[in-house]
């Protein structure tokens, strides 16, 4: 009887350790499961495309409930959607007040990143470099000359990028330091079929956002 009593606390300790390890491995801090290459982070689905960086791309744009929906559009650095009749957040008259050559800020800070603010701290708007990886490492299939795109990664998983009214254009979180003024930030652009580039566009143009996240 004494031997059984001495063994019982040890059995409980082992059980607790095994349970804790199982919990951490199974739900990745409660954010994802990875089944079929799909991870759920902060309630949103992300796809593992097998990219060298390991970056996960969201299934949908911000404001969309299906991959085929364009969702909401945002001016660069703003976290409220589709503002067209109000002044740009970072402009006073003709002068840009943040993300300039003077302050040397080249990437959106978390409070100015719509993906981080709206979807949580593990998510962000893709940088120029991250979009360039998507362009370089994936196969792109377009519905038409300026149309929707199915983007298939090295591992065979894919995401769908719907176009907006004037073509396929998506925001990055990167400021365009090469432009002569502080006017531009980088965006993904489809100029014509099979020619997708990451180039500078006006910060005040509204575009959809496709969040990314790291595992």
Regions found by a protein language model. Give the residues of each.
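Alpha-helical transmembrane segments
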Residues: 11-15
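C-terminal motif of bacterial Sec signal peptides marking the signal peptidase cleavage site
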Residues: 16-20
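C-terminal, surface-exposed recognition/capping segments
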Residues: 25, 29-45, 50-215
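Bacterial N-terminal signal peptides that target proteins for export
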Residues: 1-9
């Amino acid at each position: 009887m004494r031997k059984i009593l001495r063994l019982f606390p040890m059995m409980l300790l082992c059980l607790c350790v095994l349970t804790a390890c199982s919990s951490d491995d199974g739900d990745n801090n409660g954010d994802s499961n990875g089944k079929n290459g799909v991870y759920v982070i902060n309630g949103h689905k992300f796809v593992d495309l097998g990219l060298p960086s390991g970056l996960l791309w969201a299934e949908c744009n911000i404001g969309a409930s299906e991959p085929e929906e364009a969702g909401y559009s945002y001016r660069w650095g703003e976290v409220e959607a589709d503002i067209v009749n109000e002044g740009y957040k970072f402009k006073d008259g003709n002068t840009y007040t943040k993300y300039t050559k003077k302050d040397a800020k080249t990437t959106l800070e978390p409070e100015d990143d719509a993906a981080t603010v709206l979807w949580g701290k593990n998510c962000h708007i893709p940088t120029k470099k991250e979009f360039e990886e998507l362009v370089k490492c994936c196969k792109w299939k377009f519905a038409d000359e300026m149309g929707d795109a199915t983007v298939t990664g090295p591992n065979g998983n894919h995401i769908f990028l719907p176009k907006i009214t004037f073509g396929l254009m998506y925001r990055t979180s990167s400021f365009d330091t090469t432009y002569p003024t502080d006017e531009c930030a980088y965006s993904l652009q489809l100029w014509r079929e099979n020619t997708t580039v990451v180039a500078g566009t006006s910060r005040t143009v509204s575009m959809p956002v496709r969040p990314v996240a790291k595992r």
